Amino acid sequence: MNRWQRSVVEIQTRKRQVNECERAQVALSKVTACFQQMSTSLGSNVDGSFLREEMEETRTVAHKICSGLHRRLLSLLMEIDQGQEDKEQVERLWVIFLSSLENFQQDLKKVKVLQEIFPLTQRKDRQALVITGLAGGTSEVAARAAMVQTPWLSVEVTVSPDLKTHIEEIDVLLEEMLQRVNVPLWSVEPTQEAWVEGSSTPGVGQEEDESLEEMMEVEVVSQNKTSGCCHHHNCKVGCLLCLLS
């Protein structure tokens, strides 16, 4: 294999690894979101051993994804030279992964505190649960987390630590990531504008207000004549009063 062929193979291998990391980051976001949603039921009337087993399984999946993603991103950042086209993409994944780890660690700390307040080690412990009015369970959320797959989840086996050790491991992981790789957080630029779905062009809001007033317009039929009520453009309160009258 000559130098050109070796270079092509290296580029293809690196792109494949970057794509795997992107898919893993998406998977991690889904799993941690499910874990966070399930944690909101701790201490409520739907809490129980089944919920905590589901959370433990979800935490195990998140730990496997984090371990594999950390190793691959670290390897990529230490191998990629300055100026390579994949460098910005990998650095962006690195920053997103840092943020995801910090958020996940905060959720783990909250879960640890709630499990200490509501231990559920004995039958009488259920008397301390708060009746929040929630119905059903979190099996659907746990099923979504269980369906999440990563490119290396089936071939790499890692032992998931207990909750306390997991929190401590993330501290060590974050410190290692910040020390071994010099990626200034402020130097990483986003690929899309923030709150794109919430932005609007000038004039859109005014058109929406006008259409709302048209929908709220109340027609009064009297003596075979139709007249509009509250036609003034600032008469929103009057429209509501007309509807309530």
Swiss-Prot record:
The UniProt record lists the keyword Coiled coil: yes
UniProt key word Cytoplasm: no
GO cellular component: neuron projection
Annotated GO biological process: G protein-coupled receptor signaling pathway; negative regulation of signal transduction
Keywords: Coiled coil, Signal transduction inhibitor
Function: Regulator of G protein-coupled receptor (GPCR) signaling. Probably acts by regulating the activity of some 'R7' family protein (RGS6, RGS7, RGS9 and/or RGS11).
Assigned protein family: Belongs to the RGS7BP/RGS9BP family.
Protein name (Swiss-Prot/TrEMBL): Regulator of G-protein signaling 9-binding protein
Organism expressing this protein natively: Danio rerio (Zebrafish)
Lineage summary: Eukaryota, Metazoa, Chordata, Craniata, Vertebrata
Gene: rgs9bp
